């Protein structure tokens, strides 16, 4: 149903609302139409976990702009823009422009500067998680049901595929996603009166 599709294109939408505690809430997402394969599905998750660590290190630890921040990445078997990366978080209103610029930079530079030190712990974690999922009946049931939607098996051979993923794979995947120019930002600010009162 097109009504439930992600809005394509690049842009920023801004809104305001009265708040007792002035904070800026932001959503950053980028989307793409990518071939649904077992490897691409894993690359979406791997890439998002690397981006999450970057966001945590930069936006929380270095900038001190928010208490918590992370990113998610996933592929859907259905829909046109089937690949989604997103992060949503509150932050200090006075830092919003700086933070949003940092997120854009951290994201776009993944096209060229992902390191083995970033990739290795993510792959190790996912291999461990897959091993646990293989022992769980509900994981098997979900995987079998999902494969009927498009015939792509994405469960049994996960660990084998994870072992083949390289830094270059991650960089190319992010590059291909960003090349489709669907990078959207939504900002909810405190309205003027509340923001002034907080100064």
Segments (PLM) and residue ranges:
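His/Glu-based metal-binding/catalytic segments typifying zinc-dependent metallopeptidases
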Residues: 1-54
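M16 family metallopeptidases and their MPP-like homologs
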Residues: 23-35, 60-112, 116-164, 184-189, ...
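Bilobed periplasmic-binding protein-like "clamshell/Venus-flytrap" ligand-binding domains
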Residues: 171-189
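Long, His/Glu/Asp-enriched segments that create or flank divalent metal/ion-associated functional microenvironments
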Residues: 57
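Glycine-rich, charged/polar anion/phosphate-binding loops
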Residues: 10-15, 70-74, 170-171
């Amino acid at each position: 149903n097109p009504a439930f599709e992600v809005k394509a294109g690049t842009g920023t939408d801004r809104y305001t609302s009265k708040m007792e505690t002035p904070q800026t809430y932001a959503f950053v997402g980028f989307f793409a139409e990518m071939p649904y394969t077992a490897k691409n599905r894993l690359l979406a998750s791997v890439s998002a976990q690397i981006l999450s660590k970057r966001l945590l290190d930069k936006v929380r630890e270095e900038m001190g702009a928010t208490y918590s921040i992370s990113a998610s990445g996933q592929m859907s078997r259905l829909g046109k823009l089937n690949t989604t990366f997103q992060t949503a978080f509150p932050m200090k209103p006075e830092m919003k422009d700086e933070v949003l610029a940092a997120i854009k930079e951290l994201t776009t530079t993944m096209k060229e500067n992902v390191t083995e030190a970033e990739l290795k712990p993510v792959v190790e974690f996912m291999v461990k998680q897959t091993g646990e999922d293989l022992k769980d009946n509900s994981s098997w049931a979900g995987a079998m049901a999902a494969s009927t939607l498009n015939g792509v098996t994405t469960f049994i051979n996960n660990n084998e595929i994870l072992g083949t993923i390289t830094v270059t794979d991650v960089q190319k995947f992010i590059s291909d996603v960003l090349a489709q120019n669907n990078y959207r930002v939504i900002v909810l600010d405190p309205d003027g009166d509340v923001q002034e009162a907080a100064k």
